[in-house]
Amino acid sequence: MVVSKFVQIRRDLHKIPEIGFKEWKTQQYILDYIGTLSNEHVEVKVWRTGVIVKVKGRNPEKVIGYRADIDGLPITEETGYEFASVHEGMMHACGHDLHTTIGLGLLTAAVTERIDDDLVFLFQPAEEGPGGALPMLESEELKEWKPNIILGLHIAPEYPVGTIATKEGLLFANTSELYVDLKGKGGHAAYPHTANDMIVAASHLVTQLQSVISRNVNPLDSAVITIGKITGGTVQNIIAEKSRLEGTIRTLSVESMSRVKSRIEAIVAGIEASFQCEAVIDYGAMYHQVYNHEALTREFMQFVSEQTDMKVITCTEAMTGEDFGYMLQEIPGFMFWLGVNSEYGLHHAKLKPDEEAIEKAIVFLDQYVKWKGTRK
């Protein structure tokens, strides 16, 4: 079977997933590819492990931006691909290999046939954590090339190839990591009265957290707290001195995020008093909601529906987290789901996006950018 140029690029990238801010091989791959395109109209900047590329327009009045996240996840791959990850314990399980490939395809088209406006491509590291969008947005490297309009996409396993889905306004939730470390006094299992058990304390905390959403968030709003990991103790006959909870908070409104965190802090303070222990809360990476610019999104959906071969679906908002939300706080723009028809979902070890979606995305995005690049 003959593999197209951009499918091969995706497969090359799929082999080398890297954790946030350590995407050195990915960065070099992107730079090497751009080097094959370079001409007098292309400028390149390196920012940490990311890459920023500008294609000068013929008669620029604005700057259109495309953002692609480039990092992988600490997941052991189970796809059975011949081109599976060569980095043990790492996988492109969220489609960032496709996001990057589509960006390189769109860049190739932009160099081949320049539009009136300038185009800026942001190959952004660390979306999965600790978050690269905000520091890239604030960087000196981007300051003089800051887009006036920006767009981004995310693969959607549940939608068929040839489909995009988006909506005006709120698309993705506010998200925050949650880490709670408890420290008390350990001891022998035969003498529980001389210790204060941090496994019991952690268990009480998990149980109490379940009421935060149901009794503090408007039922017409949406929020969720998930505790995904608990660690504590050493062996079966020693009362644990320490325990740790790890989870996430997701809310559709900024106000709910603030309220939920306030209640978590009050409950943790109660655990400290009840179990005579010390507690430390760390919110880790926090991502602002993805809020699509209404007029630009409406215009994009209409264009794609009427002037391309893609099908457009108006979706509902999702509890997904995306640091692209920080860029949309500063720059008008939008994000959309790209259908890739995979049996397994995002962050799954068996995620297998349909590669046909790659060239379909490049083609219709090139159509959109050329159209948008000739409009005021």
From Swiss-Prot:
Q: Where is the active site?
A: D69, E128
- Enzyme Commission (EC) number: 3.5.1.47
Per UniProt, the keywords (alphabetical) are: Amino-acid biosynthesis, Diaminopimelate biosynthesis, Hydrolase, Lysine biosynthesis
Q: Which reaction does it catalyse?
A: N-acetyl-(2S,6S)-2,6-diaminopimelate + H2O = (2S,6S)-2,6-diaminopimelate + acetate
Which InterPro entries does the record cross-reference, listed alphabetically? AcetylDAP_deacetylase (IPR023905), Amidohydrolase (IPR017439), Bact_exopeptidase_dim_dom (IPR036264), Peptidase_M20 (IPR002933), Peptidase_M20_dimer (IPR011650)
Q: Report the GO molecular function annotations.
A: N-acetyldiaminopimelate deacetylase activity
Per the record, the pathway is: Amino-acid biosynthesis; L-lysine biosynthesis via DAP pathway; LL-2,6-diaminopimelate from (S)-tetrahydrodipicolinate (acetylase route): step 3/3
The organism's superkingdom is given as Bacteria
Report the function annotation for this chain: Catalyzes the conversion of N-acetyl-diaminopimelate to diaminopimelate and acetate.
Similarity remark: Belongs to the peptidase M20A family. N-acetyldiaminopimelate deacetylase subfamily.
Which protein are we looking at? N-acetyldiaminopimelate deacetylase
